A protein has these predicted regions:
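Sigma70-family region 2
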Residues: 15, 41-43, 54-71, 90-91
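Arg/Lys-rich amphipathic alpha helix in sigma70-family domain 2
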Residues: 61, 65-68, 78-98
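Internal acidic/polar
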Residues: 3-7, 86, 91-120, 142
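N-terminal module of bacterial RNA polymerase sigma factors
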Residues: 1-32, 150, 177-180
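Structural recognition of an alpha-helix C-terminal capping motif at a helix-to-coil junction
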Residues: 50-57, 70-82
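Helix-turn-helix DNA-binding module
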Residues: 123-131, 139-156, 167
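Amphipathic, Lys/Arg- and hydrophobic-enriched alpha-helical face
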Residues: 26-45, 62, 122, 174
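C-terminal edge and immediately downstream basic/flexible tail or linker adjoining helix-turn-helix-like DNA-binding
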Residues: 2, 43, 148-151, 166-180
């Protein structure tokens, strides 16, 4: 039934320009979108908030392009994915997201060692690997959903997941996180 709620809110927002309905969609999905950006930016809360805001603005302005062929969340994450990669493309080579200054940034001063190590492990991944790993492991998305969001083929997504998980496991194992 949650999907029916989305359809009702989308209809209200798109056809009747009902801002309250759009607000309900933002409330429902903002935590997921923000988590996606926090993982992609390795904990940069300010940048994540800016990118999330850009995502919802673009979604609002482009409601007419939502055809309902996929779920609203898939469409929204596709916008988020594009917003992030547009941001990455505009960065100067020296503005890498994998610098220690960015990796140490967080909205909380009480990050556990594990959270910091996970952030460092994510920093080792390519952007494509990080996107696939974040969507699957942190957002619980299926491979089919990831292929729709990223536009990658299923085999490519599986390959990025395999390599990304291996890199992260190797890093964490090297830093004392053994499976027991």
């Amino acid at each position: 039934m949650r999907n029916l709620e989305d359809i009702a809110w989308i209809t209200q927002a798109a056809i009747f320009h009902n801002r309250a309905a759009f607000g309900r969609l933002v409330e429902k999905y903002q935590a997921q979108v923000r988590r996606f950006f926090l993982s992609q930016t390795l904990g940069d809360t300010q940048l994540s908030d800016d990118l999330a805001q850009d995502t919802f603005v673009k979604a609002y302005l482009n409601f007419s392009r939502f055809r309902g062929e996929a779920s609203f969340s898939t469409w929204l994450f596709r916008i988020a994915y594009n917003v992030y990669y547009d941001h990455v493309k505009t960065q100067h080579p020296t503005d890498s997201l994998e610098t220690p200054a960015v990796m140490g940034r967080s909205g909380r001063d009480t990050d556990s060692g594990l959270q910091m190590d996970l952030r460092h492990a994510l920093a080792l991944l390519t952007d494509a690997e990080r996107t696939c790993v974040v969507l699957q492991l942190m957002e619980g998305q299926s491979i089919d959903h990831i292929t729709m969001v990223t536009g990658m083929r299923e085999g490519t997504v599986k390959s990025h997941l395999s390599r990304g998980k291996k890199k992260m496991a190797d890093y964490l194992r090297h830093n004392g996180y053994d499976r027991q």
